[in-house]
Amino acid sequence: MLYSKGKATTTYSIHVKQSEFAKQLGISRQALNVHLRKLRLNSYVRTGRGFIDVTEKGLALLGVSVNPAFVFIKVSPLRRSEAYQRLIELPIQRVFRVAGDMDAVLFVERERLDDALRKLAAIDGIQETKSYVTIETLK
């Protein structure tokens, strides 16, 4: 029931204890809690035991688009294993291996598309790429 009533959203999660995160920021856990409470009240983050999620509203505030770019990749059959390993190491949201005319699909933040394409150009075995930037999310 929860799944059928739910809505797909984009969030970024950090899995860290708040005490550890506060230490990394150089503030007390209590000070972090005050800041997080304000962010929660404005729906910018969700928090729980051991995690902080940045919501779509929070991402928009940070200037991160929730409408991604997709990069379709054709890989040389002789280089697939090493090319796939290099794709996994890229700082992108998701990598999918697919069947059909192309071999992989990357799910990339629009703001990181240029960087991703530069890094793809340096991977041996990448024969072709096609990039598509989404305009809006319809559903």
Regions found by a protein language model. Give the residues of each.
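A compositional/biophysical signature of low hydrophobicity enriched in polar/charged and small residues
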Residues: 1-139
